[in-house]
Amino acid sequence: NRSMANLTENFNYLQPTSFKLVLDRRNYPNLEFFCQSITHPGMILNPVELGIPRLSGIPIAGESLTFNELSTNIILDENMQGYGEMYNWMLRLVNNNLGSGSGKGSIASDTGVPDYADITLSILSSHNNQTKQVRYIDCIPTSLGDIQFESTADGQTFITFAAGFRFNYFKLV
């Protein structure tokens, strides 16, 4: 039976805590270290509707994919290093666009830091061995979430902030 030949031999279920996020370590070390959660984005194949009289449109596979945003949740350290890295990255992108009109892959002249960065999500087995990677290509930050300070929170609650990224595409490695 041909379909049985492709059936997985590993029947262990993926655990939600079995991941590691790697971003450009040289420029954004705290975003990687303090990443609490990541949501792998969905994608949509934009269909083309074929018009048939007296029938609703018949969908035909389109020519482009649309990816949702890559969403992360990051623990805020006391010095706000991770938040500062995202904030400065976003400011640098805006300043680059206003200034020289620099394009994809450009390097800001004053910092030497690339505008775009690849993000790699390593998926780990139940024994913490890497089983698969998802590589998000040419990411830019698109959102930096709110920070909520709360005087009634207990001492075991840590502040987190959301960070969103757009990317060109992803690869399963």
Regions found by a protein language model. Give the residues of each.
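Glycine-rich, low-complexity intrinsically disordered segments
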Residues: 1-173
